[in-house]
Amino acid sequence: MSMQALHALRSLYFISSRIGQNSSSQHMFVTLTAVDILAQYPALAENLLRSIQPNDMCQIPAHPHERCLDLFFLNTAELFTIVLSPEASEELLVTAAMPYLAAGANKHLLEIFEAAHSVVLAVFAIPRNGTIAAKHLPFYIDNLFAVRINPFIPIHAT
């Protein structure tokens, strides 16, 4: 039932993401309750994430609807980072986030860029994912500092 609820919320995400998923207490209640229940069953949580993972995790989709589904995946996946195995975290979460991290300077992808950062940081923060952090941290840092944080502050060559 929890998986079905999250699948239904995914189908409506193109609407709820525009009005703000935090603007409805009922939406938040259903989401967090479903996540809380599924988090008790890590294998089911992983199955859910596999069923909603981006179609092509190596590139950003051209269609806005597909990018919206990617945003739902990243936001939902972040809630399950603590119960996923390191292998699933790297295969599903880090892989899905990487294209958006690399596209950080694109202002049209800012919300997904931030979701990708959040999910990657959540994966890196879990002690058992130390090898994942060691493997992907150089790429993450290079991309983080390649993006101009404030467009009004000029970058000077040294």
What are these regions (language model features)?
Residues 125-158:
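Long alpha-helical HEAT/HEAT-like repeat alpha-solenoid scaffolds in very large eukaryotic proteins
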Residues 103:
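Short basic (Lys/Arg) and small-residue
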Residues 92, 96, 120, 135, ...:
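Cys/His-enriched low-complexity segments
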Residues 1-31, 41-81, 93-100, 110-120, ...:
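HEAT-repeat alpha-solenoid elements in large eukaryotic scaffold proteins
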Residues 84-91, 131-133:
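Short, hydrophobic/charged alpha-helical patches characteristic of ARM/HEAT alpha-solenoid repeats
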